C-alpha cells in the first residue's frame, strides 16, 4: 500500500517572531478599543534588550504604546534578565507614521474612484478546510499548535518549572495515498528553551511523557514513531536574545502549515481594512462552511483584490475531487451567501473589535474561542439546502 509524508510546524508564544506578532496585535487591539475605524499597520522588531515599534497608524485613540509593548512581553514570560530579554528593562522605541492619504482615499467609503470601501491593497488570499480534525484543520498544523499550547501551559502552571518561553514543534505525518487519510505519526520534533540546570535525559523524558503523549492521538503513535527532542542537546539561550524577531515572519505557522497555498500577506498588526488579514479570514470562513455543510471533505478558495476596488477581482475554488457539486456551482453559492467586499467582510465577521491578540500565537485558524468569528459554521445549513443536499 503506497503512502506519503507531510510535515507542518508551530512555534510557541515565546518565539521571537511570535513575540513581535503579539506586540503588534496588542497595539492594534488597544487602538481598536478606543477607535474602531482606525487604520493600523503596526510592525515590531525585538532583539536583545530592544523592542522597536514602527509602521503607519491613523487614529484618534490615545495609547501608551510603550506600556502595551512591555505588558505583552511580560505576559509572554520574558520578565527577567536571566532569560536574555526583560519586559521592564528592554529599550522600546516608537516610530509610527500616519497612513498615506493616497492609500486612504481608496479605502475610505465615499472617496476615490470606487465609492464603496475599497480594498486596502492588491493581493491574493487563500482559505482552506478539511475533515482531518474536529476544527476542520489539517492534522499536522492542528496538533503542532496543541503541542506548543501544552508547553506553555506546563511552563506557566509551574509543573515543569525549568521550561522557558521559546519553543518549536514539528510533526511529520504518514498518509495513505489511496484514501488520503492519516495512518500514523512518523516523527515528532520538539525543541524547548530550558533552564541551564536541567539534564538532557530528564528533559527529554518529561517532554515526551508530559507534553507529547497527552496531546497526540495514542493510536497514531507507533513503535516506528521517532522523537527528536532538543536535537542540538542544549537550548538555554532563546527568544529575542537568540534570534531577532519580526512581525509577519510566521505566515505558514499562522495559517495551514503548508497544506494550502499562501498569498504572502501577513496578519498581525493590521486592521481589517487590510484584505491581507480580513479576506484571508473570510476565505477560511467560506471553506470551513463548505466542508461543514458536507459539500466537500476538502476545500480551498482563492480570492484576489485591487487596491481601492470593493469587489474581488477573482474567486476560485478547488475541492480536490471531493465535491458533491461542481466547483462552478460552489462559486455561485459563495457569491450568494458571503459578501466578500471589504466592508461586507468586516460586518459579516464583526471585525472592528479588539479581538486580535489571541490570534497572534498558536494559529489564526482552527480556534474555538468566541473571538474567532471566522471559525463559525453558521452558514453550513443554508449552503447545504441551497445545494439541494
Swiss-Prot record:
CDD domains: S-AdoMet_synt. Its EC number is 2.5.1.6. InterPro entries: ADOMET_SYNTHASE_CS (IPR022631), S-AdoMet_synt_C (IPR022630), S-AdoMet_synt_central (IPR022629), S-AdoMet_synt_N (IPR022628), S-AdoMet_synthetase (IPR002133), S-AdoMet_synthetase_sfam (IPR022636). This is S-adenosylmethionine synthase. K(+) binds at residue 43. It is found in: Cytoplasm. Pathway: Amino-acid biosynthesis; S-adenosyl-L-methionine biosynthesis; S-adenosyl-L-methionine from L-methionine: step 1/1. Binds 2 divalent ions per subunit. Binds 1 potassium ion per subunit. One of its GO terms (biological process) is one-carbon metabolic process. It catalyses: L-methionine + ATP + H2O = S-adenosyl-L-methionine + phosphate + diphosphate. Its cofactor is Mg(2+); K(+). It comes from Neisseria meningitidis serogroup C / serotype 2a (strain ATCC 700532 / DSM 15464 / FAM18). PANTHER family: S-ADENOSYLMETHIONINE SYNTHETASE (PTHR11964).
